[in-house]
Regions:
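Hydrophobic, well-ordered secondary-structure scaffolds
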Residues: 16, 21-22, 284
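Positively charged n-region of N-terminal signal peptides that target proteins for export
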Residues: 1-4
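N-terminal catalytic scaffold of extracellular/periplasmic and nuclease hydrolases
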Residues: 20-228, 238-271, 304, 318, ...
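Bacterial N-terminal signal peptides
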Residues: 6-16
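Short sequence/structural segments immediately N-terminal
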Residues: 25, 34-40, 237-401
Length: 401
């Protein structure tokens, strides 16, 4: 009898082992909240993120399965001409990636109809919204994806409230909501969510585990194009969340690379660097060479440091005309007496003495004027996005003087 029981148990175990895992009914690859972060700056390595790696990973994930690809929106911060150029570049990239749903985020919802229509055209007519009331943005009826955004104060086109739209679409099992976590939780609480996933907007790294609210599964890709998400619907339940960090192990997508280079050329051609607002100052920048005669030891340390080659790193990546990059690779970009160009102000290119110690004109006239610098001098440029892992104690040892 015991032998029969053991044999039956073993047989049952073999049957269980032989049963293949249940296939996913739906696979979703998701991105969003790029916020203008098209590429890591490359100042230090390794860095994560960027649309070139994002495009490569998205293509790979879609090749591996019949995945739906969706983007949450919030392409840029919409703060000026450079963000407009970024939006153009992203529209061109999305036209190549062909997402199943390219959502209008809260940022894009502030655009005027003509700007939105132009972006939609550049994106191959893929821009969609179930909340924003514009005919050219209307998605296919009864599609499994619903695209929503909270209504910004400056919205020009009329918008429907997310809760109202969601209440009328119980068939939508994938909901994109370009609002923060607290707003996403309130939205999830407003409608039953069994078997449904809500992808929301989040500043910072995405939580590694889904949140469960009122039957809903809540996930996010985080911000600044640092992760690509993937999740499966198996047996009516959303599970197997993957958040792929866009590190240097992922190759650059060739089309995205070409689009990014074209964007940099437009930034240069429009001379955005010349349009950086500059503040007046009673003290003036004089260049590191002026410090040499009195501070020879410190000057020698500087000439052998990476700071003295900071501008060249931008030239090697074509970012030397990008105002978002140049400020931390030269002296005094936002001051009237600061860096203008390599040709006009060669003594102010690179991270020089005055980048940390401040303008030196008064000190030259009266050496007793204090020029001391401390850890706070570094933190303007050594921020987590550009200098991950920065600690003053460790980095100071490289330039101690």
């Amino acid at each position: 009898m015991i032998r029969l029981f053991v044999a039956s148990a073993v047989a049952a175990g073999l049957v269980a082992l032989a049963t293949p895992p249940r296939p996913a009914e739906t696979v979703v690859v998701f991105t969003g909240d790029i916020r203008g972060y098209l590429s890591p700056c490359g100042c230090t390595k390794p860095q994560i993120g960027g649309v070139k790696r994002m495009a490569s990973v998205v293509r790979t994930l879609r090749e591996d399965s019949e995945a739906l690809y969706v983007d949450l929106g919030n392409w840029t911060e919409a703060k000026g001409r450079q963000d407009q150029l970024k939006a153009d570049a992203l529209a061109e990239l999305f036209a190549r990636l062909k997402p199943n749903y390219l959502n209008v985020g809260a940022v894009e919802a502030r655009f005027d109809p003509a700007t939105l229509a132009a972006l939609d055209q550049m994106a191959g007519g893929l821009l969609k919204s179930d909340a924003l009331q514009a005919e050219f943005l209307q998605p296919t009826q009864h599609a499994p994806v619903l695209g929503l955004a909270p209504s910004p104060e400056a919205a020009i086109l009329p918008m429907r409230k997310p809760e109202e739209v969601l209440a009328g679409r119980p068939d939508a099992i994938i909901v994109l909501f370009a609002g923060d976590r607290a707003s996403a939780v309130r939205l999830a609480e407003s409608a039953p969510g069994e078997g449904r996933v809500l992808i929301y907007s989040h500043r910072g790294d995405p939580p590694k585990e889904p949140m469960r609210v009122n039957g809903w599964t809540l996930v996010t890709p985080g911000d600044k194009c640092r992760f690509v998400g993937r999740i499966e619907r198996v047996g009516g339940e959303w599970k197997n969340l993957r958040l792929i960090e866009l590190g240097p192990e992922h190759r650059d997508d060739s089309q995205a690379h070409a689009i990014y280079e074209s964007y940099l050329m437009r930034v240069g051609d429009e001379n955005l660097l010349d349009q950086v607002p500059r503040l007046p100052s009673d003290v003036k920048y004089v260049g590191s060479e002026a410090c040499r005669s009195c501070h020879m030891d410190a000057w020698d340390v500087w000439t052998h440091s990476a700071h003295a080659e900071a501008y060249a790193t931008l030239e090697s990546t074509m970012n030397h005309r990008d105002p978002e990059c140049v400020g931390c690779h030269v002296v005094g970009l936002t001051t009237v007496s600061g860096f203008i160009s390599k040709e006009k102000t060669p003594s102010l290119k690179d991270v020089g003495c005055e980048s940390c110690h401040g303008p030196g004109s008064d000190h030259i006239i009266k050496p007793t004027v204090s020029m001391k610098a401390g850890p706070e001098s570094c933190l303007t440029c050594h921020v987590p996005d550009h200098s991950p892992g920065f600690t003053f104690a460790e980095y100071w040892e490289k330039i101690r003087h």
